[in-house]
Design a protein with these regions (language model features):
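STAS-typified acidic loop motif
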Residues: 27-39
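Conserved beta-strand-loop-beta-strand hairpin that lines the nucleotide-binding pocket
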Residues: 1-27, 73-153
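Histidine-centered phosphotransfer motif of kinases
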Residues: 60-78
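Conserved short strand/loop->alpha-helix "switch" segment adjacent to the catalytic nucleotide/phosphoryl-transfer site
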Residues: 42-66
Length: 153
């Protein structure tokens, strides 16, 4: 199992996987283009539905995925045209559904205090408020941002 996890880490550069009990439910790579956010949302929502998550989980997972994928597209590459794709992984860890995005930026994600009239700057606040837990990890090729939802009883 350790060899599989090491191979996954080397291939994706993502480090969230630390528990051998973790089950990968799906993976998807998307280019750094805003039009791909909808595809990422549907991908995560469909997995949540297929795996019979709790009632509101598919919609919440869809919203939070939209936020972290949008952040990866907007902030995740110096030059989106030449950047590697954004890697999205959906995992199950016990009762938790974990969604992770990996991008090529080393920029540390920060929760901002957006003005009431601002049209952006609330994404990570939404992730923090609606998820069971969230965070980010640096990796050799950039960083990963992840969130967890309590998805199964």
């Amino acid at each position: 199992m350790e060899e599989i996890l090491n191979a996954y880490t080397v291939r994706t550069g993502c480090l969230h996987i630390v528990d051998p009990a973790l089950c990968i439910l799906g993976e998807k790579c998307i280019p750094h283009e805003a039009r791909n956010v909808a595809s990422a949302r549907r991908f995560v929502r469909d997995i949540a539905i297929e795996w019979n998550t709790a009632e509101a989980v598919p919609e919440i997972a869809e919203l939070l995925t939209s936020e972290i994928v949008t952040n990866a597209i907007v902030h995740g590459a110096v030059n989106p045209a030449t950047a590697p794709p954004i890697h999205i992984t959906v995992m199950r860890e016990g009762k938790l559904m974990v969604v992770e995005t990996c991008d090529s930026s080393n920029t540390i994600p920060q929760i901002r205090n957006a003005a009431p009239t601002a049209t952006s700057g609330r994404g990570l606040t939404v992730v923090k408020e609606l998820s069971h837990n969230w965070g980010w990890l640096p990796h050799p090729n950039g960083k990963s941002i992840w969130f967890e939802l309590l998805a199964w009883p």
